[in-house]
Amino acid sequence: MTSLFDALSRSNDRLPSPNFLPEDFLELLKSNDFDTKLTTLIRAATIAKREEDWFHKFQKKGELFKCIDKIICDDRWELQHQCIKFLVEAMPTFGSATEYCMCFVMPNLIPKLVSNKVTVRKITHQAIATFLRLKPEALQSFLKMLSNFMPNCNSKSELITELHHILIPELVKSNWTCLVENFTTESNIQGCEDQAGVLMKKLHYFIGNEFWQKIITNLSPEKREVLEQITANVQVEHTESKAGSGVLRASAKPQSGGERRLRFGIVPSLVCALIAEDTDANQRISGLEKMKQVVDQITPEEIARLVPHLHSYLLMLSNVLEDLNFKVVVLALDIVRATGHHLKGHMEAHIQQFVNLVAKHFGNQKSVIKQIIMMTFMELFQNINPKTVGGCLRVFLENKNSRVREEVINIYTASLMTISPSKFNLQPLVNILVPMFHDVKKRVRLAAFEQLSVLAYLLNGKTEIIMKPVRDFEQDQNSRGLTEAVTARIRRQVLPRIRYDGLIEYSTPPMMDSFDLAEAEMSLPSNADLSWIVSNGGVEPDPFERTMSPISLAGNLATIRRNRVIQQQGQAEKPSFSLPQQPAQQASHQAQRLPNGIEKSHETSENSSLDIGQRIVMTRMKSDDSFVRRQGSAASNPNSSTSSWEAPKRPPISPSEKSSISATKKEVNNNHIVKKGNLKSMRARSDTNLSEDHGEEEMENDPPRSFDDRPAKASGQYSFQDFDAAIVPSSMGKKSISHHSLPITSHPPLKHAISQPQKRINNNGTFLRSGQGQRTKSVSKPHRELTAVSKTYSLLDTSNMSVNQALKKMSSDEWADKVDGLNMISTLSETQPRMVADNLKEVIIAILNECKNLRSSVSRVAIVTIGTVAQNLNSKIDSEMEKICAVLLSKSGDVSNAFIRDDATDSLNKLVKAATAGKALQGIILAGAKSKNNTIRSSCANFVYDIITIQGSSAILNNQNALSNVLPVLLQFSRDQSPQVRNPGKQSLCFLSKDPNFDRLMRKNALESEIKAVKDVLANVEKRGGVDSLESTANLSGSLSRIGSTRRVQKKLPDSLQLDLDEIRTELLAAGWERRLTGLQRFEEMCGHASKAVASDTRLIEAFISRLGDTNGKVASCAMETYISTMGSMAKLYSTESNLKAVMNQLAHALTAHLSSKSEEHKHLARTCIQHTIRSIEPVSLLPAMTSATKKSNVKQRPFILTQYCELSKLAYKSKPKQVEVMALPLLWDSVKNSAPDVDNKKATQYLAKTLAKLIGEKQLLDLATSELDPNRKKQLDALIR
């Protein structure tokens, strides 16, 4: 754990970390930055409340309290308040060290009782009272420190007033002699005798007359006389409150009714007291209503008084917003809105706190709250820079709650529709929006596409700004169809609208409610956006991201089982013949039928409405893996549940019968609500009424009566009623959550022969539960003979099998049925290939869906099946090559399971040999050539080489289209960073070059640039030993398999830290040079205490590098000074972090540009930066960037940069001599060929030549120069060396 904030990202179901507070926690507290300290204390208070044993695990307790003691003395009251609040929250966790720790900070804590800030005073006496409540025996220590402070106190009356709060019930029987002696000393109470008398009188009533007389008898006569004088004229009322506790009221000097104290400069203290009353909602509502009147009538003078107290004012509202009372929340949000409306630009300094305040109720489904939040942000966008507000909102797009993400997107959309687009930077908005298209929730994707329409309209035809990030994201995620979906939405030319209440009304009806398009229409290109919103590009959501609902939440378990039995009896009565399939258009008009084929009447349908209603309620309870599979297989399985449920299949009916049906049957949508009109007449529904129409909970669509209607069984419940008589294994109670506990414990390579998932049997013949392994106790169940378990289709009569039957089994929830279906497809492809070929599209889609199955035993069988089908169908598989290659290549790069990689590679080998060479080559290239996974690219390069060798060189070279597709890919492979990708690419080019007509055909069918690039690659191969050297290198590099199955996961930064980084980047890119200077200062501070976080943000580094070349001289100088000061903490990261290596070129070019500056200061700073860079960063990492900068340098820049490049080459040659030769020698040839006439450039070229001659050797250097330089230039080089 690298920072304090990482602890807050831990989910509730994880075990607490043994080192809960990180090592850099103390460094954060010692930081000079105000925001860093404040944020650290806020997070620490949260941790202290949540984890009881954090203090015992923390090692440096003494140093921690030294930091706290120092922060309490800080001049800024916000830090004082938060630090003392941390003590209040953490004090119960100190245990036996409470007295020692609190007495350590008490001398600096007591003076805060007389602070000029009411907030600090309140939290201080709360901390002291908490301490004394936990440790009553520590009262004497506290009173002695109080006595030491009294003589030096300048506000004794305020101090005495605050001491009333320590009269708590736990201290009734304690010894108060020290306090009485202190207050009977004349020097201590001079000028505040009345307040001291009131306190003494209250103490008298508090401890009782018996203890009071004991204290008085021990006083000296002088002090006894002083005590009688100060208490002589004081009267204290002793009344009983409702709770039964004693309440003392002093009547010495009552305040006049006209006097009142104002909190925050504008709010009467009486109103604040009503608001603070959290036990009585009516009083709090009354106080909020009065406060609302004050805020609505605020004057400019009152605004000036409120602004200095704005932090504590918003803190008070934040506490109120945590109330559970609806009216309280609405009034508080309305006050927040009014505050932002009246303060306008004054709110910018507290914008992050303001946004976090309102964000407490993001995702709330109450219409009033959503309206107030929308109004608040619309006014905020108008009064403050929209870019600042948008940056604060961005962090909530990563919230786990999908309703929060949807609401934030709608706020962005509304702001774009109401604010001038010139105030926004649309490109970053597009970059933020694009990942939302791939969100796991339909509602979020729908909201994102609505915002897309608005952005496309504002860009006024410049769609490339949108399409480029979409294509990049699609490539990064290896998802297909997003570009088409975005294009379809842009072509619709429809926009959402803002309703009368300020909320967004979508331009298209949400697919979760009703969708009047048939499935055939969904596949049209014009509806690609709707299809994407429904299916998310066919990507199955992770079932472990959803919380498993316990069976008890589903309702009456007895009712569920009774409905299940009725359903099984109904299914048993059905005839066992298969009905022909019909198109979706006809199926939507078919009538319901009873099991015996008789048509249901309208009355019968109405009588079953109660059962339908029960099923609607039960759909929320379905198991998560069936829900996931239902979404993923929507387009593939005609008999499975989809987002648009089809009617049951039946034979064609006559037109007269259709008319009679339509006259009696009401058309209902997916939620069984009677439709009132078609899609054109339907009012689009907003994000608000989307949930209001459904009641408090959102329901899933009700599928047909099929396998999805089976209620989820409780974990550990097993039944044999769901299976055929020949099948013995029990059903799974719960899906296995890890591939380590699968039934296949040994992982033999799967062959194309039929495979059945093995069942492990214990000694007594009972079965172990699937997914539990040997750790599960055996359960005695009735079972049949073992011979019935091993069912192989090779021994069955294949005439009884059909593709539809196999697809139905594959759509089952049970993994064993899925494997049976896959094995049936494999057998049918061997025995009846014509049947499989006629239904090839449906078969391939179903198998590919199972390739993505989370259970590896199913996915492996599916991967092997796809290879078997391809092997048996040969060229008939060509039409599905692209889909198959995309899935299998992604599986060949799977880092979690080496056996899946091997199976995918075997199936691809069969696919490549079976399909047409041209189609196979095209599919392989499209699926893997541009992947970012090294293993996938390596697999792709090897298969391309295999296909080229199968097809032959002449077939490629003579076909201009084929050559134009293959040649750029092979050049890309030959330049790849991974040797496993480079070597097959070079081998392919070498194979083509062996053709006798290679040169002629290349000149005829290839471009000149490609011919030159190919020659360079072939020359490099020959220089390194030819094709044989490539094969030996490939053998040394290893195969595609990886050692281990783990992947390094990039940890997500905490939201608060990421927000700081975003703010710094915004300031670095600001239009005003003063803000850019501020951004540089904050960047330097952030590098000092969170360098790894800075290094992880590539955009922040790029923004900093852009300041190195700033047009403003002050900013550029400050940036270079900042670069030098941060080099100590960032140097190692520049050498190791891949994202920083990617920006090294920009850094080198930015520094080199100042070498030709007219300003001597800039030139000196640039030289210093370059020298520090070469000394600090690892030479091999820096060498490519410096080579590029040296090549592009001009005449003025070249002498210095070339000299420094020589020093870098000396350092890098020790570890990477070949790399230095490859990079430095072309630079030397270029310098000799194009040498400048001035003396400095000649000296620099001579220094480079001598350096390389010393490193490589003079003779070898001249030999290498023979093929690069003409004789005259070679003589010049010889003269330079000598």
Swiss-Prot record:
GO terms for biological process: axoneme assembly; chemotaxis; hyperosmotic response; microtubule cytoskeleton organization; non-motile cilium assembly; sensory perception. HEAT repeats lie at residues 59-96, 100-137, 162-209, 261-300, 308-345, 349-386, 388-421, 424-461, 838-875, 879-917, 919-953, 961-998, 1095-1132, 1177-1214, 1219-1258. Residues 702-712 have a biased composition (Basic and acidic residues). One of its GO terms (cellular component) is cilium. Changing A281E: Disrupts the predicted tubulin binding sites and leads to strongly shortened sensory cilia on ASER neurons. SMART domains: TOG. Changing W815E: Disrupts the predicted tubulin binding sites and leads to strongly shortened sensory cilia on ASER neurons. Residues 575-592, 633-644 have a biased composition (Low complexity). Residues 33-240 are annotated as: TOG 1. The TOG regions are composed of HEAT-type repeats that assemble into a solenoid structure. They mediate interaction with microtubules. Required for normal structure and function of sensory cilia on amphid neurons, especially for the formation of distal ciliary structures, but is less important for normal assembly of middle and basal ciliary structures. Plays a role in the organization of axoneme microtubule bundles in sensory cilia. Required for normal structure and function of the ASER neuron that mediates attraction to NaCl. Required for normal chemotaxis to NaCl. Required for normal avoidance response to high osmolarity. In contrast, is not required for normal chemotaxis to isoamyl alcohol. PANTHER family: CLASP, CRESCERIN-LIKE PROTEIN CHE-12. This is Crescerin-like protein che-12. It comes from Caenorhabditis elegans. The gene is che-12.
